[in-house]
């Protein structure tokens, strides 16, 4: 006759469930050596190498085949996302550079137009300086003409005086080419004579 266990707990403690067994792993995983050329090669080349061999940044010795496969798939997805993000960033950078080049070109065009306008303004300023100098020369010439006219008037007065002095002793009439200068002071009235007085005797 089979003996019954004293309790159900004893029977459960004696048996071991295979599902609860845990795999023992080494406490300190071995560090993965990164290839030296991975630190010096360009980013694009590194992304290509990671797509081909994702295990270059993982340690397959520490995982089972299924874990390593899932890890490789995750690395591939990550590399793909990084590549897509880098392509998007490259497109954004190209667009930004295109906008900057367009702005620089527009700035150069406006600068050239400003230079042309500045040259034209400078030329107009040169003409205005020439006109100003010509006006000053005309003023100087006008003053010289006035001085010459005054000199001619003085010469005519001297000629009249000479003609008058030579014509005093002769009967030749004197030609008044120049009128006599006006009196400085007005002529005072003369005193009345005794004949002009109206005296009642």
UniProtKB/Swiss-Prot annotation:
- Gene Ontology process terms (BP): exit of virus from host cell nucleus through nuclear pore; symbiont-mediated suppression of host cytoplasmic pattern recognition receptor signaling pathway via inhibition of TBK1 activity; symbiont-mediated suppression of host toll-like receptor signaling pathway
Q: Which UniProt keywords apply?
A: Host cytoplasm, Host nucleus, Host-virus interaction, Inhibition of host innate immune response by virus, Inhibition of host RLR pathway by virus, Inhibition of host TBK1 by virus, Inhibition of host TLR pathway by virus, Phosphoprotein, Viral immunoevasion
From the record, which residues define motif Nuclear localization signal 1?
A: 29-36
Sorted alphabetically, which InterPro entries does this protein's record hold? BDV_P24
Per the record, the domain of life is Viruses
From the Swiss-Prot or TrEMBL record, state where the protein is found.
Host nucleus; Host cytoplasm
Q: Which coarse location class applies to the principal site listed for this UniProt protein?
A: host cell
> Where is the stretch described as Disordered?
1-70, 176-201
Task: Pinpoint motif Nuclear localization signal 2 by residue range.
Answer: 181-193
Q: How is it modified after translation?
A: Phosphorylated by host PKC epsilon and casein kinase II.
One Pfam family name from the record? BDV_P24
Q: Which GO terms describe its cellular component?
A: host cell cytoplasm; host cell nucleus
Subunit (UniProt): Homomultimer; only active in its oligomeric state. Interacts with nucleoprotein/N. Interacts with matrix/M protein. Interacts with host TBK1. Interacts with polymerase L. Interacts with host HMGB1; this interaction is required to stabilize RNP on chromosomes.
What does this protein's UniProt record list under function? Essential component of the RNA polymerase transcription and replication complex. Acts as a scaffold which brings L in close proximity to the N-RNA complex. Plays a role in the segregation of the viral genome in host daughter cells during mitosis by interacting with host HMGB1, a host chromatin-remodeling DNA architectural protein, thereby stabilizing RNP on chromosomes. Interacts with host TBK1 and thus interferes with activation of cellular antiviral state. Inhibits cellular histone acetyltransferase activities.
Additional record remark: The P/X gene has two overlapping open reading frames. One encodes the P protein and the other the X protein. The P (p24), X and P'(p16) proteins are produced by ribosomal leaky scanning.
Q: What is this protein called?
A: Phosphoprotein
- Organism (species): Borna disease virus (strain V)
